[in-house]
A protein has these predicted regions:
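Short, charged low-complexity intrinsically disordered segments located at boundaries
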Residues: 60-72, 94-101
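A short helix-loop-beta-strand connector motif used in the catalytic cores of GNAT acetyltransferases and
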Residues: 54, 67-82
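Acyl-donor (CoA/ACP) binding surface of acyl/acetyltransferases
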Residues: 1-33, 37-47, 80-195
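Conserved GNAT-fold acetyl-CoA-binding loop/helix
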Residues: 46-67
Length: 195
């Protein structure tokens, strides 16, 4: 019975370290740093994200987010991480391995964001490179998927630099910033060479 429980409801992943970054599960104590980084990055992030609710940066909304994160991990649906700069433990962004499908699929979808003041410094590249082995070797996924808006050159570069291959083009794939947007579809398989 313990084996079944481990497979169906894994514990949250431990912190993951990469080149200059540490990834760990978000905690309520991260609220101040998270809300400040998101607020100062609002203009930078909103073209690439779903519309933010009016209370998105409130403590109550963050508390609800923490509850959802815990439930998603408990049920093996998603694994969220905040990304911290290793040298001073400053929050620089976040990523999530979500929409986990078990059974014959063994796949999940990646989402990520980086604060405006930390963009183009290699933090998200290091974070993805650190997460990929855990996704394949610890969570035992076979396939990782990601999608990005065709005009998001930084995201395209990030995915290709971390070994994702473009697989397609999806029309009006996600509602981003209030508009149904086309997306490029990327994937990476367990058998693909590690970057």
């Amino acid at each position: 019975m313990a084996l079944f429980r481990t497979i169906s409801s894994p514990e949250p992943l431990p912190p993951i370290t990469g080149d200059g970054v540490t990834l760990r599960t978000p905690q309520m104590t991260d609220f101040v740093a998270w809300s400040a980084l998101r607020e100062e990055s609002r203009e930078f992030l909103t073209p690439w994200e779903p519309t933010w609710p009016s209370d998105d940066l409130s403590r109550a909304a963050f508390r609800q987010r923490m509850r959802r994160y815990a439930e998603d991990q408990r049920t093996d649906q998603a694994y969220p991480f905040f990304v911290f700069r290793k040298e001073d433990n400053e929050l620089v962004g976040g990523l999530v391995l979500a929409n986990i499908r078990r059974g014959v699929a063994q796949s999940g979808s990646l989402g990520y964001w980086v604060g405006a003041s930390h963009a183009r410094r290699g933090y998200m590249t290091a974070a993805l490179r650190a997460l990929i082995p855990s996704a394949f070797d610890v969570l035992r996924l076979h396939r990782l998927e990601a999608a990005c808006i065709p005009t998001n050159v930084a995201s395209i570069r990030l995915l290709e630099k971390t070994g994702f291959q473009r697989e397609g083009y999806a029309r009006e794939y996600l509602c981003i910033n209030g508009i149904w947007q086309d997306h490029l579809l990327y994937a990476r398989l367990r058998v693909d060479q590690r970057p």
